[in-house]
């Protein structure tokens, strides 16, 4: 496919404007054998033949790659002809397949059948092609791609258009391309196939990955993990807009395909970026410099202009990158090289750079606390030559650095070319430098994580029982996993509820009363949760309200049942869930409890199974992690306890019957005494559940819908909310609610 001896274009044309003509022009510089086929208008005298067999007979060398520039209806026959003539790979450019309805699906099926029968590998359909500048091969209907410089960065993109756009952007940033592939519909060759190919490709130093759909999540993750062990991968995932899709629980609503794909790629070791500009900056750096694995690399900054240096320092600090103060010995050495009024602790402000600039760079880079150096300087007249200074300082692979050069375009381009030739990444602004620094540090941190293969599920873990569980049953199951829950009593009658109240409401302790029914998923939305019950009269009023609920489809054999439960202490509420993702398999999600989690999108996701140690790091990814570390005198999360609970939940899902789609604890409250599960939901596919007033019965597991990005679960009606209670001044329960117990009412999280 990517290193053919010869290429044949089927559907070639001499008419300008035709796809086949553009492809023929793109291949003009290919050094191997070339042949053109046009069954309708053959011109043997002009080198255009009626069939691949005829073309092969008149061509020196083997034709390995067939490029199909024919309509969808003719692709299967053309592919079969190419395979019969000895071609081993094919590029199908046409659209009009699966995306075009039933007729297009038939064309796609016909292509698959030919590929399966003959063994020919197929890239596409619906792609603008690929290019391999190192081999002089441009199999693209964008002839300008033939002018891309050869280099060591590979691009693997879902879209042929994005493949070209990224390659041109990378070239504009002073980079060269080893391979650029647009996957298109991915009927046969997928991104995972290309990534596996690149593992052993000596001409590729780093890989840029763009994803829209993932046909096989576990295979993609395995390919990225293997590739990252050899060379860095920078990934951009499309599909942020699907975060608003509804699902049956917070876990489903939060573990969207976009979030899950990004989390899976991070867990595999890729550096995940937010946009194409950041991708270009990241890969520009990582293709030249890769820090040793390090849990927390230190950044040193040397700037010849204070303002831009401060921009870089400010952004790096916001990214959580450590900027250590330089040692006393380093500062003493800098003091002998710089004017007395300059700042010399880190960042180092040199003032207008002079003849000592190279020595300043070398001294700062040699500081034992500095693992990476970032440099900023303008190309001022009669000032320092930045590229020469960087090389004189020994910056490069042995002394990792990124250099930002500002100034007129021509001057910057000249400096950048020299720096890149020396193996030093050159950027053109503080933001680009910060992107590069973050990528280098992220890559080092991820490789420093304990290299544990995906752990096996604990064989001793008990799975969820086959039948649907109500809240009491779900909490009892959590108890078998060692997860603490409030003291409670399940009651079949009002009399039992009163006896439970007398037992639990000791010393003025208030209780919660809830409807108990496995068919009701979101109890508060139908008035099925009553909090802060302190007297028998209040209990009767609560029971009356629950008895008045209509249309809930109660599954209780004797009618309405109740759960009477002790109120929990105040604390900070989390959501923790394990679910089956349709693309990546089992995943675990953690975030703030309640609707705030969905609104803020502040979640951490991991593929499961996972070790308690890996799960323990999840809360540290949350933007609101300060709430878990004793905010204003509040409770402190024991990471080890959290890791044990999360890993246990993942193991429980794996040990459960296939129809158990999800296990969720929301809220999982952090209190002074540790974690306690205040509510639990176990979702079975095909089980009937109630979703709020007037919602009727909705069936879970109704199917999978495509959001235009990674596949995501079909949306249910609503997701459970939940108040977040925290220490005074942080997150508080809504007015009129009893602090310290779950509620599905929306909470104001402005102070959080």
Where are these regions (language model features)?
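Long, intrinsically disordered low-complexity tandem-repeat segments
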Residues: 693-735, 739
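Catalytic-core regions of core metabolic enzymes
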Residues: 1-692, 748-752
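Short, cationic low-complexity segments
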Residues: 737-738, 742-752
């Amino acid at each position: 496919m990517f290193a053919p001896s010869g290429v044949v274009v089927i559907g070639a044309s001499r008419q300008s404007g035709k796809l086949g003509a553009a492809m023929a022009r793109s291949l003009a510089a290919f050094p191997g054998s070339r042949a053109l086929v046009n069954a309708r208008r053959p011109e043997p005298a002009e080198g255009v033949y009626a069939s691949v067999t005829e073309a092969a007979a008149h061509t020196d060398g083997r034709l390995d790659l067939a490029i199909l520039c024919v309509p969808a209806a003719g692709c299967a026959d053309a592919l079969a002809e190419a395979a019969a003539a000895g071609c081993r790979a094919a590029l199908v450019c046409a659209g009009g397949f699966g995306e075009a309805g039933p007729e297009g699906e038939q064309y796609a099926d016909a292509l698959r059948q030919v590929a399966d029968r003959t063994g020919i590998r197929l890239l596409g359909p619906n792609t603008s092609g690929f290019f391999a500048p190192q081999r002089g091969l441009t199999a693209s209907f964008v002839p300008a791609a033939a002018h891309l410089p050869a280099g060591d960065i590979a691009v693997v993109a879902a879209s042929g258009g994005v493949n070209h756009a990224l390659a041109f952007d990378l070239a504009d940033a002073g980079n060269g391309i080893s391979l650029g592939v647009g996957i298109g519909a991915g009927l046969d060759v997928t991104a995972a196939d290309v990534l596996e190919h690149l593992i052993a490709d000596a001409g590729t130093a780093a890989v840029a990955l763009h994803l829209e759909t993932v046909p096989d999540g576990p295979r993609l993750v395995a390919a990225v993990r293997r590739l990252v062990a050899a060379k860095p991968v920078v990934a951009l995932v499309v599909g942020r807009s699907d975060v608003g899709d509804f699902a049956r629980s917070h876990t489903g609503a939060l573990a969207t395909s976009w979030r899950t794909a990004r989390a899976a790629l991070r867990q595999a070791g890729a550096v995940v970026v937010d946009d194409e500009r950041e991708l270009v900056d990241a890969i520009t750096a990582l293709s030249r410099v890769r820090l040793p694995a390090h849990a927390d690399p230190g950044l040193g900054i040397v700037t010849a202009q204070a303002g831009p240096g401060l921009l870089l320092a400010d952004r790096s600090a916001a990214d959580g990158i450590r900027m250590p103060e330089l040692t006393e010995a380093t500062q003493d050495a800098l003091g002998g090289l710089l004017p007395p009024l300059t700042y010399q602790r880190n960042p180092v402000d040199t003032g207008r750079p002079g003849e000592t600039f190279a020595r300043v760079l070398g001294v700062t880079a040699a500081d034992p606390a500095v693992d990476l150096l970032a440099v900023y300087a303008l190309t001022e007249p009669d000032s320092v030559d930045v590229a020469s200074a960087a090389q004189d300082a020994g910056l490069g692979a042995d002394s990792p650095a990124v250099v930002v050069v500002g100034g007129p375009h021509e001057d910057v381009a000249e400096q950048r070319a020299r720096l890149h030739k020396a193996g030093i990444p050159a950027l053109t602004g503080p933001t680009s430098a910060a992107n590069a620094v973050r990528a280098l540090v992220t890559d080092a941190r991820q490789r420093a994580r304990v290299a544990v293969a995906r752990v096996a599920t604990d064989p001793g873990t008990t799975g969820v029982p086959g039948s649907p569980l109500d809240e009491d049953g779900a909490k009892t199951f959590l108890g078998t996993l060692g997860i603490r829950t409030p003291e409670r009593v399940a009651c079949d009658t009002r009399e039992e509820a009163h006896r439970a109240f007398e037992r639990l409401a000791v010393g003025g302790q208030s209780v919660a009363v809830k409807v108990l029914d496995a068919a009701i998923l979101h109890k508060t939305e139908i008035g099925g949760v009553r909090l802060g019950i302190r007297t028998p009269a209040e209990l009767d009023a609560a029971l009356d309200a629950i008895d008045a609920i209509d249309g809930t489809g109660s599954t209780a054999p004797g009618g309405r049942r109740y759960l009477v439960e002790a109120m929990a202490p105040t604390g900070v509420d989390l959501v923790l869930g394990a679910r089956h993702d349709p693309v990546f398999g089992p995943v675990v999600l953690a975030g703030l409890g309640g609707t705030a989690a969905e609104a803020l999108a502040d979640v951490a996701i991991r593929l499961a199974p996972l070790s308690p140690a890996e799960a323990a790091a999840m809360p540290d990814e949350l933007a609101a992690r300060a709430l878990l570390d004793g905010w204003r005198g509040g409770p402190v999360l024991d990471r080890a306890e959290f890791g044990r609970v999360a890993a246990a939940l993942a193991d429980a899902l794996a040990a459960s019957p296939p129809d158990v789609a999800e296990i969720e604890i929301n809220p999982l409250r952090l209190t002074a005494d540790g974690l306690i599960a205040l509510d639990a939901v176990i979702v079975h596919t095909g089980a009937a559940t109630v979703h709020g007033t007037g919602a009727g019965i909705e069936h879970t597991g109704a199917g999978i819908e495509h959001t235009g990005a990674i596949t995501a679960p079909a949306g249910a009606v609503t997701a459970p909310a939940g108040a977040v209670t925290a220490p005074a001044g942080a997150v508080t329960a809504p007015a009129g609610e009893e602090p310290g117990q779950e509620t599905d009412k929306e909470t104001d999280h402005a102070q959080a």
